[in-house]
């Protein structure tokens, strides 16, 4: 039988009750399909152009709505999962569940939070940020006069917020500012009382046979991890030294032998280890004992590089780095122009643990630098990444990411090399330098340079200008199957990267590309005289380059004035990191939506 119009109406109302409202008349939350976090986005996440929060007390999806504008087309699909602290949050752009317009690139996440606690925190950061509006800040690695984003910061009006007004969540204003981070204690440790600690460091001419926690020999031995690999520390170091003595090719880039290493480093070291002068040659020195306690390397700095971490909203496979900087000594323990940097990954995988570790660095300020208490606390920090088996998932169980060298002591020009640990042989091997093509692609390199090679570089820069200017690019291993990334980096006096006049269309792209290379950062782009951390004689702290402590440089091509002060940038970064993962999901979410990792290796 046909139903009457009244019956159809009643059934329709009942259907609406079942599908969208529930029988008590309350609207049901809009469902979210299973959505996984994309770990591949850790180093290249989508960055929200703006983030706002809005209070909606009667919405069934939640009471706080985070609205993130990524721009249309930035994120593919209608749902985007991200970790806020230790909890997954799914944002939506399907026009449902509190989202505005479907497919407009403005994603919404519904949270259920304590309104009073949230309002109090918003009030606190609104008040605290007033003092920072005129303070210099950083765009990428460059210091600018002030953070223009803070101009959007408005006083928190609780009544307006409770009534539904949106409040902006500014990346620089997600927590009360921490202003007392100590660069000397917690970021770049060069104090003589630390780097010449008599129990943890070495002085091969006056304190031979040192095997303390921060000595070159101890760190290399732990890197070899004999108990796990069967490779002794001595064998590990000998193979590394031998790699300098023969010519080789890395990714199509020829590396000549640096045989002066034999006379500068190897010969004096083998003699100090007990062999008679004249009893060995460059061909058979490796048959003689090499005492790692007499290694001719002086610790010059211990460096916190947590700022190199990825975006924890997607995963924490890259928690930043911890570094030891060594200067090479000659046979009389005088410093040479040859630095060796051990760059370890921080083996931490959880947000809360990473924040606690950042606070360990920060808390070093409570001790007198160079005191017994300070040095013990610092060793507790460095053991996390430097000890044997610090990261069992990596080759040799070592957390080492790479060893980098920068020297002219072995011959002109200044040359930078990079070494990784091989998972099969358990030895160090030469690998490509990062973010720098082979020098043949640089019009500023010593002749002969082919215009066709330079054009390859210029075309790549032009094609990737947007990512390069935002420091989100990665120089590829090859282009069209032809090797591109360099096997070494040569830093010439006054050197930088460029093409023929007019070939690189955007001068900012040229600058950022050149700045991100080893040679550009250690050269003309920052007015650095090759070394960011100098090698001083014993009893003297290392001299730091202007790029670290503050310098204004005119662009070598455009003439644009730029100011760098990277330790200040790292100071701000450590302060912001310590605000994370405190159970304030709203603010953790806003942070990961706006945090852009840096790709620069320096």
PLM features: residue spans?
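Short, solvent-exposed loop/linker segments at the N-terminal edge
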Residues: 53-62
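Solvent-exposed serine/threonine-rich low-complexity stretches and specific carbohydrate-binding patches
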Residues: 87-98
């Amino acid at each position: 039988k046909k139903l009457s119009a009244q019956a159809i109406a009643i059934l329709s109302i009942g259907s609406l009750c079942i599908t969208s409202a529930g029988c008590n008349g309350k609207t049901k939350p809009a469902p979210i399909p299973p959505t996984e976090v994309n770990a591949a986005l850790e180093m290249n996440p989508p960055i929200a152009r703006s983030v706002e929060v809005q209070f909606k007390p009667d919405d069934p999806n939640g009471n706080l709505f985070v609205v993130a504008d990524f721009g249309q087309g930035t994120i593919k699909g209608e749902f985007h999962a991200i970790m806020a602290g230790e909890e997954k949050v799914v944002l939506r752009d399907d026009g449902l569940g509190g989202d505005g317009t479907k497919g407009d690139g403005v994603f919404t996440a519904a949270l259920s939070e304590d309104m009073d606690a949230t309002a109090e925190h918003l009030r606190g950061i609104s008040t605290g940020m007033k003092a920072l509006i005129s303070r210099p800040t950083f765009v990428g690695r460059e210091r600018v006069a002030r953070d223009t984003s803070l101009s959007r910061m408005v006083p928190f009006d609780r009544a307006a917020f409770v009534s539904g007004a949106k409040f902006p969540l500014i990346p620089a204003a997600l927590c009360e500012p921490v202003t007392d981070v100590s660069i000397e204690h917690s970021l770049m440790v060069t104090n003589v009382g630390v780097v010449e600690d008599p129990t943890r460091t070495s002085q091969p001419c006056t304190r031979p046979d040192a095997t303390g926690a921060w000595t070159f020999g101890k760190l290399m031995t732990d890197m070899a991890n004999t108990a796990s690999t069967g490779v002794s520390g001595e064998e590990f170091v000998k193979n590394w030294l031998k790699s300098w003595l023969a010519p080789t090719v890395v990714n199509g880039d020829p590396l000549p032998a640096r045989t002066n290493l034999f006379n500068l480093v190897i010969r004096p070291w083998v003699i100090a280890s007990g062999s008679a002068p004249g009893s060995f040659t460059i061909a058979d020195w490796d048959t003689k004992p090499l005492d790692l306690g007499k290694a001719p390397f002086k610790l010059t700095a211990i460096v916190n590089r947590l700022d190199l971490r990825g975006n924890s909203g997607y995963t924490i496979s890259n928690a930043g780095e911890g570094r030891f900087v060594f200067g090479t000594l000659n046979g009389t323990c005088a410093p040479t122009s040859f630095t060796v940097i051990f760059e370890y990954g921080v083996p931490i995988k959880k947000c809360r643990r990473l924040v606690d570790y950042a606070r360990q660095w920060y808390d070093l300020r409570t001790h007198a630098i160079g005191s017994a208490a300070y040095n013990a606390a610092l060793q507790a920090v460095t053991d996390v990444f430097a000890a044997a088996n610090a990261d069992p998932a990596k080759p040799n169980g070592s957390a080492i990411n790479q060893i980098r060298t920068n020297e002219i002591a072995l011959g002109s020009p200044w040359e930078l090399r990079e070494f990784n640990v091989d998972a099969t042989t358990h030895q160090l091997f030469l690998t490509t330098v990062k973010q720098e093509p082979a020098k043949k692609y640089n019009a500023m390199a010593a002749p002969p340079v082919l215009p066709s090679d330079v054009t390859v570089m210029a075309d790549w820069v032009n094609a990737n200008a947007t990512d390069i200017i935002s420091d989100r690019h990665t120089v590829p291993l090859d282009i069209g199957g032809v090797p591109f990334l360099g096997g070494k980096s040569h830093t010439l006096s006054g050197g930088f990267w460029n093409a023929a006049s007019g070939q690189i269309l955007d001068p900012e792209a040229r600058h950022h590309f050149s700045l991100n290379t080893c040679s550009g950062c250690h050269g003309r782009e920052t007015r650095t005289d090759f070394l960011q951390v100098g090698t001083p004689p014993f009893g003297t702290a290392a001299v730091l380059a202007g790029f670290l402590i503050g310098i204004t440089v005119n662009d070598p091509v455009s003439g644009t004035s730029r100011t760098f002060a990277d330790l200040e940038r790292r100071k701000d970064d450590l302060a912001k990191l310590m605000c994370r993962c405190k159970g304030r999901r709203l603010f953790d979410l806003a942070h990961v939506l706006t945090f852009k990792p840096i790709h620069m290796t320096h």
